[in-house]
């Protein structure tokens, strides 16, 4: 099969090496029936050197710091002894720059040893100052902790002092730099001799002047002096930086880290108790163990020589190799941690398992279920304090159960256990992310500080080495002054960001905050900006200098919060209905004490317009709104309970009228019975948004029929002769009436009685007018048949009389209509006084 395998086409310049090359080789070896045990043994042989390095590092790291430092100091010190020994015996007069080699390497030994002695002093200084600072207030005593973080800057400062104090005595004091001065003195003595004589005495004075010292010694002396000044500036910068970091961690994370450690310890104790619980071997627990990786089910599901088993073993070999490489890299990268003043603390296997578990959401929930299933038999929904007796020491049961039982129900459900572990996981990841981002911000601030220290160091060295320092300083000051106008805005933004992030620090990673009435979640922190995520998922970046001027509401740091809901009810709502509503809501929150506090505040806020009554319902959560999903579930639960309580109390609603409902406003329609075609085609007014007790503006304008100028009416197809008659008649008739009224239920009887009286009077007047017209026409026809000779004259007279009668009847109908309209206006005024509404 392998011989006939087709090679894939490779283009020019294509590299065959990939990340899966080693895995493909391992799979090919499996195809050739290579046993996984042989591969494992082969990899152990290949990684033997790495195992040795890791083992040596662990052994070396477990030694005391004195032993480690002596081990690091000894190789270089031994190397410096070789030229020192050469300058003692074989070549005692060997010199370097006018100084014997022996004294040069003596000073190098002193400098190298002084560095490690300074390390020891800097390490022991906090332990020495703790008892001495105990007499001071605690606010000063706690700052001695900063000394533990200043070990390296203090060591550099002490070492520079040692170097500058020992260089001149050794190099100049032991060097052969002499200038000989010969002085001759003559003394006269009085003797009883015949001649006077004088004796000349020559005196030789050996002096050492500055001119005789080599120039390189002068230069090194100046360099060491500048190094002392630079070390002082560096120490001050580190003190300032660590003071900011200490204050930040103390204020922001002291209690959070303490609480998280306490909860993690409780979780570890519960896990230990679950291993010895009565139901620790149930199928439910074993499923959670498989998710946690505590058991290996491959032996039950696969044979020894199956391909899947081999592939899993290959993956295991690759994972072990990766772990070995990681350990080797850590060993190499931490080889100089002792020199940098950093120390790692090993964790116990239990702590490592808990910390690894709470980093994963799935494993975190599996751990909670494992503990709960181990303590609770199948069919039960909670466990009590008595279930922990014998598994946890008696003096710790009360504290542990107090932490788990947040609602004081004396039981712990599965939801509470999952919520407990979920909060530990979220808090742990939040603290880790916040500390990481803050450390990065401190690192950036440290780089800025080191840049300033570097500039000061350059100026310091120039001032020590150059005599014309004043000229250089003037030129540098002019340049700095000109650049200040360019970077003034950036410098101001930097200072505002530093104050906002390290002094104010209104939020941390994963906090839910409200800025400008918009809810955000903090994603990351930086020195100059902050990244947020909206509830919709979009990412927002805001400069810290701008956030420094805004009001920020932090939900995570808030205490258990409350929410207020405003409800509008009819003005006729009484006190008993409100108290009934409050009692129902209070019963609901007591039944759901895991979510709400047993408090309900109901307050009437406003009824100034006398058309409605506004009141507020305030309920209290058991926690803040940091967990958005949990807050939404609780709010929906309460809103549904509020809806049911309002329906139970029969509280009337204030809403738009609904046709056909007896409890809500209704619509009345009145048509013109004389011309029904107008009623069918008349355009009706739109349904406006008014309440049942709002006043109608149309009442004050024209109570009665609606205006006809703004509406168009159409008629059916008729003869041309009758169209003109209809048009003439339209001028005397008003359009069809459409009365829309929105009133309360208790106003209906009076209004209906007035409308019925109006309708009955209108119908009777129309019947009388029709009867009169018919009777007049009959009499006219009889007269025409009896008197044929006077047909034209009589017909003309009859027509005149009929027309006059129609005019009289029409006038009577108009008078009746006006009277009915007045009656209708009286009914309307009465209804309006009763707070009704009529709209035309």
Curated annotation (Swiss-Prot):
It comes from the Eukaryota. The gene is msy2. Changing residue 423 to A: Viability does not decrease in a calcium-dependent manner. The keyword Hydrolase does not apply. InterPro entries: EF_hand_dom, LSM_dom_sf, MS_channel_C, MscS-like_plants/fungi, MscS_beta-dom_sf, MscS_channel_2nd. Disruption phenotype: Upon hypo-osmotic shock, cells display excessive increase in cell volume compared to wild-type and undergo cell death. Changing residue 407 to A: Viability does not decrease in a calcium-dependent manner. PROSITE patterns: EF_HAND_2. Changing residue 394 to A: Viability does not decrease in a calcium-dependent manner. Residues 90-100, 148-151, 247-449 are lumenal. Residues 677-730, 775-819 are annotated as: Disordered. One of its GO terms (molecular function) is calcium channel activity. Belongs to the MscS (TC 1.A.23) family. GO terms for cellular component: cortical endoplasmic reticulum; endoplasmic reticulum membrane; membrane. This is Mechanosensitive ion channel protein Msy2. It comes from Schizosaccharomyces pombe (strain 972 / ATCC 24843). Changing residue 399 to A: Viability does not decrease in a calcium-dependent manner. It is a multi-pass membrane protein. One of its GO terms (biological process) is calcium ion transmembrane transport.
């Amino acid at each position: 099969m392998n011989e006939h395998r087709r090679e894939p086409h490779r283009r020019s310049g294509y590299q065959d090496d990939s990340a899966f090359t080693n895995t493909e080789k391992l799979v090919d070896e499996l195809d050739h029936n290579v046993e996984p045990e042989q591969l494992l043994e082969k990899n152990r042989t290949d990684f033997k050197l790495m195992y040795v390095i890791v083992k040596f590092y662990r052994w070396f790291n477990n030694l005391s710091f004195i032993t480690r430092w002596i081990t690091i100091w000894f190789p270089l010190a031994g190397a410096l002894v070789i030229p020192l020994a050469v300058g003692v015996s074989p070549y005692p007069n060997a010199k370097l720059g006018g100084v014997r080699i022996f004294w040069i390497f003596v000073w190098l030994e002193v400098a190298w040893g002084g560095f490690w002695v300074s390390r020891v002093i800097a390490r022991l200084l906090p332990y020495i100052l703790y008892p001495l600072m105990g007499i001071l207030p605690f606010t000063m005593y706690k700052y001695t902790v900063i000394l533990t973080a200043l070990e390296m800057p203090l060591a550099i400062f002490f070492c520079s002092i040692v170097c500058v104090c020992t260089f001149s005595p050794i190099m100049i004091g032991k060097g052969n730099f002499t200038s000989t001065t010969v002085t001759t003195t003559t003394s006269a003595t009085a003797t009883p001799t015949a001649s006077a004589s004088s004796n000349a005495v020559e005196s030789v004075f050996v002096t050492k002047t500055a001119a005789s010292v080599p120039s390189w010694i002068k230069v090194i002396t100046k360099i060491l002096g500048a190094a002392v000044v630079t070390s002082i500036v560096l120490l001050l910068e580190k003190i300032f930086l660590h003071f900011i970091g200490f204050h930040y961690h103390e204020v922001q994370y002291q209690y959070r880290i303490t609480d998280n450690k306490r909860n993690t310890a409780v979780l570890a104790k519960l896990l230990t108790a679950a291993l010895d619980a009565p139901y620790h071997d149930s199928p439910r627990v074993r499923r959670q163990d498989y998710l946690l990786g505590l058991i290996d089910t491959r032996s039950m599901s696969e044979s020894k020589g199956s391909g899947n088993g081999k592939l899993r073993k290959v993956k295991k070999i690759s994972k072990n190799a990766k772990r070995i490489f990681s350990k080797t890299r850590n060993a190499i990268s931490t080889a100089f941690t002792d020199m940098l003043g950093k120390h790692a603390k090993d964790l116990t296997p239990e702590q490592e398992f808990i910390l690894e578990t709470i980093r994963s959401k799935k494993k975190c929930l599996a751990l909670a279920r494992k503990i709960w299933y181990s303590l609770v038999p199948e069919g039960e929904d909670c466990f009590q304090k008595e279930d922990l007796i014998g598994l946890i020491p008696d003096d710790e049961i009360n504290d542990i159960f107090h932490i788990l039982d947040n609602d004081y129900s004396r039981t712990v459900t599965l939801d509470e256990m999952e919520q407990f572990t979920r909060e530990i996981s979220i808090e742990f990841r939040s603290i880790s992310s916040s500390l990481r981002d803050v450390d990065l911000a401190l690192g950036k601030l440290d780089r800025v500080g080191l840049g300033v220290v570097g500039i000061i160091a350059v100026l310091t060295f120039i001032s020590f080495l150059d005599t014309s320092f004043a000229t250089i300083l003037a030129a540098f000051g002019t340049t700095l002054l000109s650049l200040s106008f360019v970077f003034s805005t950036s410098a101001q933004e930097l200072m505002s960001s530093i104050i906002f992030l390290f002094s104010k620090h209104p939020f941390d990673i994963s906090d839910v905050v409200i800025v400008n009435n918009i809810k955000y979640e903090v994603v990351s922190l930086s020195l100059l900006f902050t990244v947020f995520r909206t509830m919709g998922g979009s990412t927002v970046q805001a400069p810290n200098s701008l956030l420094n001027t805004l009001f920020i509401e932090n939900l995570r740091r808030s205490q258990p919060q409350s929410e207020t809901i405003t409800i509008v009810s009819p003005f006729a709502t009484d006190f008993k209905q409100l108290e009934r509503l409050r009692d129902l809501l209070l019963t609901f929150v007591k039944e759901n004490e895991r979510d709400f506090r047993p408090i309900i505040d109901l307050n009437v806020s406003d009824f100034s317009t006398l058309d409605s009554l506004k009141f507020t319902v305030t309920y209290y959560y058991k926690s803040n709104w940091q967990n958005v999903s949990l807050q939404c579930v609780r709010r929906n639960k309460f809103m549904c309970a509020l809806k049911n309580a309002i329906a139970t109390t029969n509280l009337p609603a204030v809403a738009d009228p609904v046709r056909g409902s007896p409890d809500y406003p209704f619509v009345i329609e009145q048509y013109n019975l004389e011309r029904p075609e107008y009623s069918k085609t008349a355009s009706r007014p739109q349904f406006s948004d008014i309440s049942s007790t709002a006043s109608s503006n149309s009442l004050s304008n024209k109570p009665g029929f609606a205006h006809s100028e703004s509406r168009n009416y159409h008629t059916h197809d008729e003869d041309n002769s009758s169209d003109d008659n209809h048009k003439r008649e339209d001028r005397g008739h008003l359009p069809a009436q459409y009365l829309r009224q929105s009133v309360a239920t208790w106003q209906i009887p009076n209004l209906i009685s007035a409308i019925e009286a109006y309708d009955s009077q209108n119908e009777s007047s129309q019947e009388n007018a029709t009867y009169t017209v018919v009777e007049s026409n009959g009499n006219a026809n009889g007269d025409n048949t009896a008197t044929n000779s006077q047909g034209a004259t009589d017909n003309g007279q009859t027509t005149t009389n009929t027309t006059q009668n129609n005019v009289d009847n029409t006038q009577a109908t108009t008078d009746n209509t006006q009277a009915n309209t007045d009656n209708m206006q009286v009914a309307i005024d009465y209804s309006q006084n009763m707070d009704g509404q009529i709209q035309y």
